Amino acid sequence: MALEVGVPCDECNRCAAGRYNICAGMRFRSSAKSFPHFQGTLQQAINHPAKWCHKLPGDMPMELGALLEPLGVALHAFRRSGLVKGQKVLVFGAGAVGLLCAAVAKIKGAREVVIADIDAGRVEFAVKKRFADTAFTVPMKRGKDVDEGLAIARETAAEVGKLTDREGKEVGEVDVCFECTGVQACVQAGIYVSNNLSSNATETDIRQATTPGGKVMLVGMGNPIQTLALSAAALREVDLVGVFRYANTYQEGIEILSRQASEDPDFMALVTHRFTGLDNAVKAFEMAGKTKDESGNLVLKVVIQTEKAE
């Protein structure tokens, strides 16, 4: 059984429209957003409304069931993006959600999926395990002021555009950018992402180079106050689209994780570390806060397997 851990009011207009993820009365387990806090899920047993419990296939490993929640975010982002088969995609952030956004884009027929992260190991993993087609390691640069920060974002966008895709051509401009970091520089680069754009390009050059009508999906949650080049988006109708949690995604997620196609991403590889018993919860959270473990292995998705009750 996989729990959809948000419990909406089921009475408001948003719930009636199927957009219960933005229900004002939502109570979300393990979240401190609302008060009084709802019970968390790190318990041996828990009572949860049957409506939000989803039965897993008998042959599905529990680790895959644990991916349904982040996969739900990816599916919700995909649906809001309007991505269609044959389009090109850029994903900023190669954590669990970013990898799953890339995976969904590939499964849904994206022509090229580029994944970008500051961690070279993560983007290499993404390509090796078939989550993405092309990897890009984002340089660790920070601007000392707004102008320098925007210049770095344009430079990053230009470098992405010069990458070589599976057909041996330049990636160029992309149709949809899934921004899964919440980092200001990545949101800026997502707006700018273009083909053959030099780091000293003018605002006019940018408006001519970036895909008109493209979308930047705001999946990651970072600093709530950010400086963005809105003119670069507005004058070419590049949409900035918010993504908050998920709604009506678990059944499709189960279908995706149940697929056996050889070209699909290796979803099991996403679960890199396992801990047994609630006594190890602190160790599990400490591991989840790392990018690599003591042996130098990547840390992506960490799961806690509770001991069965007697």
Model-derived features with residue positions:
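C-terminal hydrophobic helical "lid"/dimerization subdomain
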Residues: 188-191, 198-207, 247, 251-310
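Glycine-rich phosphate/adenylate-binding loop and adjacent beta-alpha elements
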Residues: 1-53
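ADP-ribose/adenylate-binding Rossmann-like module
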Residues: 178-179, 192-225, 240-243
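Glycine-rich helix-loop-beta junction characteristic of Rossmann-like nucleotide cofactor-binding loops
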Residues: 79-84, 107, 169-170, 208
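Residues in the short beta-alpha loop(s) of Rossmann-like NAD(P)-binding domains
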Residues: 118-119, 222, 246
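A glycine-rich, Thr/Ser-enriched phosphate-binding loop motif common to dinucleotide/cofactor-binding enzymes
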Residues: 36-42, 58-80, 92-100
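Rossmann-fold dehydrogenase core element
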Residues: 211-219, 228-269
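Adenosine-nucleotide cofactor-binding segment
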Residues: 91-94, 106-192
